[in-house]
Amino acid sequence: RELRKKETARANWIAGVSHDIRTPLSMIMGYAGHLLGDANLTDRQKKELDVICRQSQRMKNLVNDLNLASKLEYNMQPTDLEEINIVAVVRQTVVDFINTNPEEKYPIQWLTEDSLGICLVEADKGLIGRAAGNLLQNSINHNPEGCSIYVTVEKDKDRCRIRVEDDGQGITEEQLEKLNHEPHYMMCDENVTGQRHGLGLLIVRQIAQVHGGTMQIGHSRYGGFEVII
């Protein structure tokens, strides 16, 4: 009971800090966005404001990820379980991702068999979509020069698998060992070594576990990184 109280207090503290950060951050983003609309700005000023907007959005995403990771870790994230079609959810996530990230150096290929139109499971639609989106973003984050991303939904008896892989730079055997056996390695600062996989993958693992599943990390058949949930 005492441990549970400490876990709840920690989760509430993180939620409070997240809220306190989001409020001034929203003001910074709002003012920066407003200033960007000024026709009298010099090119340098536009670039600097654009950096402020992008980095503020990045910080906001990190705060949201930290809050979600904390709630998932301490079973404080409400789950809305319903019968969903995993194929449709992941396909829509891919479509939304393409529409909001139109960079040509990150083409996404949908490799799910045409015959697999439906794969029904009891799951939280929002969390499954979040997990798939995090995997797509992970490939982009770790391949700044670009890569092709391959998405497959597979059915195995009464379970569904989501496979996201790329043909990017991949990871070493040492990094793979740490990612598979030391979950908190995924949270380490990316400045410490050349390859880190922050809160995004940790959240994917937590979402899989909430649904009674697992996350497997490995080398892609295309030469890059692969994650299966």
Q: For each of these PLM feature ranges, what is it?
A:
Residues 54-59:
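Short alpha-helical segment of the dimerization/phosphotransfer core of two-component systems
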Residues 74-79, 118-123:
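Conserved micro-motifs of the catalytic ATP-binding
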Residues 100-112:
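Short conserved segments within the C-terminal catalytic ATPase subdomain
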Residues 138-140:
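Short helix-loop "hinge" at the ATP-lid/N-box region of the Bergerat-fold HATPase_c
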Residues 166:
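Acidic ATP/Mg2+-coordinating residue in the GHKL
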Residues 171-188:
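Short conserved segment of the HATPase_c
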Residues 212-213:
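Conserved glycine-rich
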